[in-house]
Amino acid sequence: SVAKSAQFPLHVWLPDAMEGPTPISALIHAATMVAAGIFLVARLLPLFIVIPSIMTGIALIGIITVVLGATLAIAQKDIKKNLAYSTMSQLGYMMLALGMGSYRAALFHLITHAYSKALLFLGS
């Protein structure tokens, strides 16, 4: 889940996926690839809620990913890499919401992020 949704320790593949054509980048970053990890954690959330240390770990990974993604997005000159790191930061917010136990907020953010980021990629 951490690798699939480009969270903190395993986030290095995300900007390199921007080398392809724009419609493929929009599909990867908005709908399918990065959403799968968040959706997996959301589906397994009833199991994770039982153990508070797992929830704390999920929230901590989310916080680190938010800060790292936003910082790396500020430093980019390429618009596609900027959007990739922005996606990483937004996925960190979703992971943080799941770590705090807010299933609905995380899935709402996932759906709205998919639409807005797909339009941003197609417009870049």
From Swiss-Prot:
Its EC number is 7.1.1.-. It comes from the Eukaryota. Keywords: Chloroplast, Membrane, NAD, NADP, Plastid, Plastoquinone, Quinone, Thylakoid, Translocase, Transmembrane, Transmembrane helix, Transport. The chain crosses the membrane at residues 22-42, 44-64, 91-111. It catalyses: a plastoquinone + NADH + (n+1) H(+)(in) = a plastoquinol + NAD(+) + n H(+)(out); a plastoquinone + NADPH + (n+1) H(+)(in) = a plastoquinol + NADP(+) + n H(+)(out). It is found in: Plastid, Chloroplast thylakoid membrane. GO terms for cellular component: chloroplast thylakoid membrane. GO terms for molecular function: NADH dehydrogenase (ubiquinone) activity; quinone binding. Pfam families: Proton_antipo_M (PF00361). It is a multi-pass membrane protein. One of its GO terms (biological process) is ATP synthesis coupled electron transport. NDH is composed of at least 16 different subunits, 5 of which are encoded in the nucleus. Belongs to the complex I subunit 5 family. NDH shuttles electrons from NAD(P)H:plastoquinone, via FMN and iron-sulfur (Fe-S) centers, to quinones in the photosynthetic chain and possibly in a chloroplast respiratory chain. The immediate electron acceptor for the enzyme in this species is believed to be plastoquinone. Couples the redox reaction to proton translocation, and thus conserves the redox energy in a proton gradient. This is NAD(P)H-quinone oxidoreductase subunit 5, chloroplastic.
